[in-house]
Amino acid sequence: MKETIRIIGIDPGLLRTGWGIVESLGNSLHFIGSGTVTSNAEMDLASRLCQLHEGLSKVLHEFMPHEAAVEHTFVNKDATATLKLGQARGIALLAPAQAGLPVAEYAPNAVKKAVIGVGHGEKQQIHMMVKVLMPRASFDTSDAADALAIAICHAHHRQSIVSARRMQALLAG
């Protein structure tokens, strides 16, 4: 028997952290919600991280996902910016883990491959395919669209794992 799994995808960023929630039932995906949690750029780093944590925690409490997926961040030439992005990513991992969710991580090229079929592509291609895969999807920022793509990637990945386990069980007899 198939079960519906609610997945939150999170696209971490210090100024804007995108989130997108989908429900996966077998091979079908349904859009549940998306949005962006922001931090005030004029505040100190610790306060900004608290804003992100509080915002993500509210989303998790409101939508009650079963699993989370977070995108790996890329290394920037600016070491300070990379470190700050890493700290925001830490919040993106912490909030769902504190809520008791299993958290998966995906490289940006894995997300692109799952959504557009190739590991390299433009943001517009990703956003267009998110709308093709889920016509009712809406997103207020590119960060929210990217978060939906991360959730879609996780749904496809976990479906492959479930199928492989079923095949192993059948072969084992």
Curated annotation (Swiss-Prot):
Cofactor(s) demanded: Mg(2+)
Domain of life: Bacteria
Active site: 11, 71, 143
Location in or out of the cell: Cytoplasm
Function noted in UniProt: The RuvA-RuvB-RuvC complex processes Holliday junction (HJ) DNA during genetic recombination and DNA repair. Endonuclease that resolves HJ intermediates. Cleaves cruciform DNA by making single-stranded nicks across the HJ at symmetrical positions within the homologous arms, yielding a 5'-phosphate and a 3'-hydroxyl group; requires a central core of homology in the junction. The consensus cleavage sequence is 5'-(A/T)TT(C/G)-3'. Cleavage occurs on the 3'-side of the TT dinucleotide at the point of strand exchange.
E.C. number(s) listed in UniProt: 3.1.21.10
EC class name: hydrolase
Cofactor details (free text): Binds 2 Mg(2+) ion per subunit.
Gene3D superfamilies xref list: Ribonuclease H-like superfamily/Ribonuclease H
SUPFAM superfamilies, per the entry: Ribonuclease H-like (SSF53098)
Gene Ontology cellular-component annotations: cytoplasm; Holliday junction resolvase complex
Keyword Lyase: no
Catalytic activity: Endonucleolytic cleavage at a junction such as a reciprocal single-stranded crossover between two homologous DNA duplexes (Holliday junction)
Record-linked InterPro entries: RNaseH-like_sf, RNaseH_sf, X-over_junc_endoDNase_Mg_BS, X-over_junc_endoDNase_RuvC
The protein's assembly and partners: Homodimer which binds Holliday junction (HJ) DNA. The HJ becomes 2-fold symmetrical on binding to RuvC with unstacked arms; it has a different conformation from HJ DNA in complex with RuvA. In the full resolvosome a probable DNA-RuvA(4)-RuvB(12)-RuvC(2) complex forms which resolves the HJ.
NCBIfam families, A to Z: ruvC
Family: Belongs to the RuvC family.
Keyword Thylakoid in record: no
PANTHER family assigned to the protein according to its UniProt record, in alphabetical order: CROSSOVER JUNCTION ENDODEOXYRIBONUCLEASE RUVC (PTHR30194:SF3)
Pfam families: RuvC
Keyword line: Cytoplasm, DNA damage, DNA recombination, DNA repair, DNA-binding, Endonuclease, Hydrolase, Magnesium, Metal-binding, Nuclease
GO terms (BP aspect): DNA recombination; DNA repair
Protein name: Crossover junction endodeoxyribonuclease RuvC
Binding site for Mg(2+) 2: 71
Record GO terms (molecular function): crossover junction DNA endonuclease activity; DNA binding; magnesium ion binding
Positions that bind Mg(2+) 1: 11, 143
